[in-house]
Structure formats: structure tokens, C-alpha cells
Amino acid sequence: MASAPHKIAIVTTSLAQGGAERVAANLSVMFCQLGYEVHVISINNSIDFHYSGQLYNLGIEVQTKGWLRKIQKAILLKRYLTSQQISVVIDNRTRPVFWREVVYKWVYQNRNVIYMMHSFKLENYLHKSHILAHFLYTNNTQFVAVSQAIAQEIQRKYGFKKVQTIYNSIPDFTESQAVPTTESVPYILFFGRLDNQVKNFSLLLQAYKKSGLSDAGLQLKIMGDGPDAAFILEQINQLQLIDFVAILPFQSEPFVVIQQAKFTVLSSQYEGFPMAVVESLAVGVPVVSVDCQSGPAELIQSGENGLLVPNHNAQALADAMYELHTNTALYEKCKNNAQKSVEHLSLKSIRAQWNNLLQVIYEKHD
């Protein structure tokens, strides 16, 4: 008789909007393909991305408000993990609040937990205090960082030993065939969460203004949802770009819009392993990006599949945008190299790396 499949729980804030949340959805698909029994546990009732496995939506299960709501969610999560006999948990949440993580330490008691690290801004995931971080996470805690730079920074700052880099994979649906161009006006594209503190739209819009691309007939489209949509619109008006910049709503499958862009742009203060860059290159669209910590430098070979420029420099970003638009030979080279530059992020390759890690964990505890 065949043995029952190993069980995995993926705990995520939601399955909507953010790059980390999309990664959680992609992991659920990947683990189901590997034959694991997958349980996706969403803290909030926000479900947009395609996922596989059994969904436990705590946002629906708990109806109370305030701090009591958070406590009830934690209790229900612990009960669910116990009732389903789940021994391995992948925690995909941000973890900035110490006392909340004390509660989750109790929730995860006697289980193998893999803590995802999606951002170079480590305080979003680990307490700034070395002592408190080591109280929450022992030296045997397994961390998976989505970039080499993040993994190195965790080891340097905290001294944790079990830190592994596994890049985010290219989603299945980016591997579709090219779509015919339907847009009459050419454009460049930013896509992601509309959060100025992270994505730095001020820099993006200033650079676009300086680049002169609006005069050349190349529009800028900004696609996504988030708290700073009104701020971005105000900046567009102040820079007198209202006729040249369009804000598009978030799309759970944005790849047609990406494919039709001439190139995409990233202007972030910080990242982890920016899926916007991965997804753009995967559909053959070059990227102009600032060299923020971390991720772009591990994805973009400047002059080969896009252009990488110093961060917080509007003129440098503007010059790169103008260069990729006007230098036909450079553009064609970057476009031709884009897809093959992320072949190492294929679903098959990343799936094998995850399977190897999980098999080691299960073999130790079976």
C-alpha cells in the first residue's frame, strides 16, 4: 500500500495583490505537483491568485473585531494544524511585531517551520534585537531567502546558520505564447503594489519627466492597487504628465499587459527578489531598474537583458529609459536575451530545490 503524502501548510497574509502573496500561491501549485498534500491558510479574506490544495480562510472563520480577532485566528490556526496532523509549515507572512510572533511560536510548537524572507528590509521579518530574534527563532530554525543578498545579510546580522537561498520561480502562465499587439500607443510599464515608501513613485515619475519619452510618444502605465494611488495621481498632476501617464487597476494575471510593453521599470527603495523583474523578463520584455537591495543585481545583466542604474538618481534612471528606447541595437539585444536570462528560474528547477529541502526535513523527523 502506498504511503500517505506528506502534509504541508503554507501560512500567508492573503492570496492577493503583493508579490510575496503571489509566491505563496505559486508554492501551493508547485507542492501539489510534487505530490504533497497542501493546505493554504490565509489570515485575511483576500483571495485573487490561483492556488492549489485545500484553503482554510481565517478571514471568514473569525467574525470578531480588534485584538480578540487576532487571538481567535491564532487559536483556530493551531487547532487546524493539530487536527490535520500537519508537521511542516511554511510561514510566508511579514513578522515585525514581537508579541504577535510570541503567539505564533506557541501556534507552531513542535512543528518544523520554514520562515520565508521576502525582503532585504529584515526588520519586516526579524526583530531588530539580536536577543529577541534568537528567542523567537533558534539556531535550528530554517530560513529560506529569496535572494543571495538577503541570505548573506541574515547570517551577517543575526548569525543564524540554517539559511538557504531559493529563488522565486517563473509562474506557469508566463510561459504562454506571445500575444498580438492591440495597443495603438506604445508604452513602458510599472506594475506592483502602489506603495510609495517601497516602490518610490516619486523617483519613477521624475525620471520619466526628465527622460523626454512623453515627447517621443511613449506613455508610462502604472498598474496595481495600494494605499498611494491618490498620491501618485497628485504627483502626475504636479509634473504635468496627466496626458502621458495612466493608472491601471491591479490584475491577477497581468501578462498580456506586460508583453505589450516596450520595457518595464523598477524604481524601488528596497526589494527582496522582485517578481515584476522576473515576470517581465520571462515574457521577453527588458527591464530598466535601479540597483536597490536586493534582487535586481541578481537578475539584470546591464546591457544584456536590461539596464541597471544607481538608486535614488532620477537623471540616471531617465537616461537609461531614454537609451533603451532610442538605441535600437541595444533594445533588440536585451529583448532577445530576456527570456533565456531567467531560464534558471524555471518551475522545474525551483521545484527540485524545494523538494530537496523538504525531503531532508521529513527524513529527519519521520
Show where each model-derived region lies.
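Conserved donor-binding/catalytic core segment of Leloir-type glycosyltransferases
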Residues: 9-11, 181-199, 205-208, 221, ...
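N-terminal strand-loop element at the rim of the active site
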Residues: 10-71, 157, 357
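A conserved mid-protein helix/loop that constitutes part of the nucleotide-sugar donor-binding site
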Residues: 21-26, 195-210, 227-233, 315
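Short His-centered aromatic/hydrophobic patch
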Residues: 91-98, 117
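Nucleotide-activated donor-binding/catalytic signature segment of Leloir-type glycosyltransferases, i.e.
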Residues: 233-250
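Aromatic "clamp/platform" in nucleotide-sugar-dependent glycosyltransferases that forms part
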Residues: 269
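Short hydrophobic beta-strand element within catalytic cores of glycosyltransferases
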Residues: 286-290
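Conserved acidic donor-binding segment of nucleotide-sugar-dependent glycosyltransferases
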Residues: 301-303, 307-314, 322-328
